[in-house]
Amino acid sequence: MTNQVTIIGAGNLTTSLLTAIHRKKFSYKINVIDTDKKKKLVLKKFNVSFFASYTDVLTESDLLILMVKPNNYIQVIKEMNPYLSEKVVIVSFMAGIESSLIKSKLNHNVPVVRCMTNVTISDSESHVFYHMKPFSNKIVKRLDKFFNNFSKLKRCINEEDINKITALYGSGPAYYVYFNQIIKD
């Protein structure tokens, strides 16, 4: 393993995750891919490698974290497919997109783990809930190695539980952040 993680998407949840990572100062190389080049300035303080298009960094990554809007997932997977390797684990934080849908769009048979957390992860006070099918202790160890540096990893037996967690735990704080941004503006 290379201790390299690539995050696709640079929105609020990515910023929260990077804040937690930055505070803990652990030894992962972090890449972020987002087509909005303005996000590079926002992420500069986190000391990450920023890319505006898909590159070979996907091939070299241990974990590929999808943090894009669910309506963009088909295009994202289509664009990243040529760069995927068999060793990567895809970790999806996309609300409402089941693992089977992601797997059906991939060119490679790689593990897909569906996760959810919320913006409080920036304070290292959050849980990361996950579901994978089939279950693999080897993959859980990879997830533990990364996420347990700044959060608590919790397994969901059923993928439906991730949908419930998304509604209550993921979306609630996100709407609060959105509401506060509207008030400020």
Stretch-by-stretch model annotation:
Residues M1-A52, D56, E125-S126:
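NAD(P)+-binding Rossmann beta1-loop-alpha1 motif at the extreme N-terminus of oxidoreductases
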Residues N3, Y28, V48, V88, ...:
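A structural micro-motif
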Residues G9, D34, V68, S92-M94, ...:
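Short beta-strand/turn micro-motifs composed of small residues
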Residues N12, K37-K38, N71-N72, I97, ...:
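Short alpha-helical
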Residues L17-L18, F46, Y54-L66, P70-H127:
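Rossmann-like NAD(P)(H) cofactor-binding subdomain of soluble oxidoreductases
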Residues N31-I33, F51, V91, V113-C115, ...:
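Hydrophobic/aromatic beta-strand patches that form the interior of the parallel beta-sheet core
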Residues L101, K105-P111, H127-K164, Y175-D185:
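Internal alpha-helical scaffold of NAD(P)-dependent oxidoreductase catalytic cores
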Residues M116-I121, T166-V177:
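Glycine/serine-rich anion-binding loops at beta->alpha junctions
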